[in-house]
């Protein structure tokens, strides 16, 4: 089984988003403990190269107790949301410190993603959509061709939604909606053979499935 995990809660709205919050670390520690308690031992681990990916994996490993060293895979890195939004919005963005501004941020992101995926825009410093999807496909191909046991991928919402879209053949609009629904530390499962991946579950948070952890469920 391939387990694709979105990073824990990062520092949305802060000067440096690419850093787990204290809650994000707890989310990932709880996930690692859940994996261990269910007898899941990973044959291999891949992760993106962003700080939040490394910190999330470290917390998962702390909770699990026995996780192999990871292969760093740049194709699992997230898109640059600020560069995307600059293609549809001129000038500085207000700090997302209220529900209204938060919603406005994601409306702009949805619009910007659609333009990028359709090839209408070329956000500064970012790959094309086709190159982005190729990076994700390369990680999936690597898993299929080299492994037979349980594999862990730690990445972000964009690459995970893209992977699901590739497996299911979804439209760009559907891929965007999948992306914006993925929760922090959520697990998406693919069964796989040397020839294909099959979606088993999406956006699952079994490690947070308790009343006392309801407030631990986050999206950014």
Region annotations inferred by a language model:
Residues 8, 157, 203-205:
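Active-site metal-binding loops of divalent metal-dependent hydrolases
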Residues 32-110:
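Phosphate-coordination/substrate-recognition cap region in phosphate-metabolizing enzymes
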Residues 77-101, 130, 145-150, 165-220:
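Acidic, low-complexity terminal tails and accessory targeting/binding regions
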Residues 110-146:
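Internal catalytic-core helix/loop-beta-alpha segment
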Residues 2, 147-155:
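Generic beta-sheet signal
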Residues 38-40, 143-148:
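Glycine-rich phosphate-binding loop signature in dinucleotide/nucleotide-binding domains
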Residues 157-161, 193:
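GST superfamily/GST-like fold recognition
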Residues 3, 8-61, 125-136:
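Loop-to-helix element that buttresses phosphate recognition and phosphoryl-transfer chemistry
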């Amino acid at each position: 089984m391939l387990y694709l995990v979105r990073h824990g809660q990062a520092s949305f709205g802060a000067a440096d988003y690419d850093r787990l919050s204290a809650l994000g670390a707890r989310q990932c520690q709880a996930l690692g403990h859940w994996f261990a308690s269910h007898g899941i031992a990973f044959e291999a681990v891949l992760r993106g190269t962003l700080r939040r990916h490394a910190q999330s994996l470290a917390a998962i490993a702390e909770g699990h107790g026995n996780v192999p060293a990871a292969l760093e895979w740049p194709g699992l890195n997230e898109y640059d949301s600020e560069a995307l939004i600059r293609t549809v919005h001129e000038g500085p963005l207000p700090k997302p410190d209220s529900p209204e501004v938060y919603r406005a941020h994601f409306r702009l992101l949805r619009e910007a993603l659609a333009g990028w995926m359709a090839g209408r825009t070329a956000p500064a410093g970012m790959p094309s959509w086709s190159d982005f999807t190729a990076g994700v496909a390369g990680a999936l191909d690597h898993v299929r061709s080299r492994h037979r046991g349980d594999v862990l991928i730690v990445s972000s919402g964009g690459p995970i939604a893209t992977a699901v879209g590739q497996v299911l053949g979804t439209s760009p609009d559907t891929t965007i909606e999948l992306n914006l629904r993925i929760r922090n530390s959520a697990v998406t499962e693919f069964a796989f053979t040397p020839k294909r991946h099959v979606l088993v579950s999406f956006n699952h948070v079994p490690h947070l499935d308790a009343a006392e952890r309801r407030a631990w469920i986050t999206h950014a």
